[in-house]
Amino acid sequence: MPTIQQLVRKGRQDKVAKTKTAALKGSPQRRGVCTRVYTTTPKKPNSALRKVARVKLTSGIEVTAYIPGEGHNLQEHSIVLVRGGRVKDLPGVRYKIIRGSADTQGVKNRKQARSRYGAKKEKS
């Protein structure tokens, strides 16, 4: 416990809140270049081959980003747009790639939740 005199001299220091998406540097999204596209397996009760990519962002930081939806056209040197948002069963994956922007195509034959996957409205 500090004395009154110590508080007068130094004062209290505010706690600094740590952001969950540090690599975006305060931006809502950031552009980047894929350095590696691969699959990885999720944590214990789940089983799958989740599609992820290592992305070098314009902020200079390299992050692992999840590729949502079924099927993708990404490969090394693809330009992608990255947003925040973790994948609960993939440790260390705290970003997601935005489908339908830059070099990333939208999901084919997507009928519902199309805006999340960059899918165009089907011609009726």
Curated annotation (Swiss-Prot):
GO terms assigned for molecular function: rRNA binding; structural constituent of ribosome; tRNA binding
Keyword Repeat among record annotations: no
tRNA-binding keyword on record: yes
Residue ranges, annotated region (Disordered): 1-30, 102-124
CDD domains named among the record's database cross-references: Ribosomal_S12
Any single Pfam family the record assigns to this protein: Ribosom_S12_S23
GO BP terms in the entry: translation
Any Gene Ontology CC annotation: small ribosomal subunit
Composition skew (Basic residues), residue ranges: 108-118
Keyword entries, A-Z: Methylation, Ribonucleoprotein, Ribosomal protein, RNA-binding, rRNA-binding, tRNA-binding
Subunit structure: Part of the 30S ribosomal subunit. Contacts proteins S8 and S17. May interact with IF1 in the 30S initiation complex.
Protein name: Small ribosomal subunit protein uS12
Organism whose genome encodes this protein: Saccharopolyspora erythraea (strain ATCC 11635 / DSM 40517 / JCM 4748 / NBRC 13426 / NCIMB 8594 / NRRL 2338)
